Amino acid sequence: MTTTVLKVSDLISTSDKSWQDAVEKGLDRASKTIRNIKGIDVTNWKAQVENGKIIEYRVVMKLAFEVEQ
């Protein structure tokens, strides 16, 4: 019987386009140094506003990845 162990790391990512773009950029960047990513949980959505317009979308995510044996 095999046991899977996951580790969870917090990540903050930003975009000037959208929240979805911020999530995708964060996942893409994390994938360059973390292997076996199994899921993400976006825990917070924020935006920076200037002159009535959103200038930055920010997401806080929990990234789950499998610990290698």
Describe the residue ranges of each PLM region.
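Conserved beta-strand segments that form the floor/walls of ligand-binding pockets within enzyme
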Residues: 7-10, 41, 58-62
